[in-house]
Amino acid sequence: EAVDFDSQCVPTADPGKCKFYFPMWNVNVFT
């Protein structure tokens, strides 16, 4: 799942999505 979020945040084409998933991704990676 982390890869999925990273892939969507890499192009930063969707800042809204990236920002919305950023916290979830951060928690997933840190947890």
Swiss-Prot record:
Tell me the ranges covered by the BPTI/Kunitz inhibitor domain, including all copies: 1-31
Question: What are the residue positions of the site described as Reactive bond?
Answer: K19, F20
Q: Does the keyword NAD apply?
A: no
Q: Where are the transmembrane segments?
A: none
Q: Which domain of life is it from?
A: Eukaryota
Entry keyword set: Disulfide bond, Protease inhibitor, Serine protease inhibitor
- On whether Disulfide bond is a keyword of this UniProt record, the answer is yes
Q: Which GO molecular function, any one, fits this protein according to its record?
A: serine-type endopeptidase inhibitor activity
Its biological purpose is as follows: Serine protease inhibitor. Inhibits trypsin, elastase, plasmin and kallikrein.
Q: What is this protein called?
A: Kunitz-type serine protease inhibitor RsTIQ2
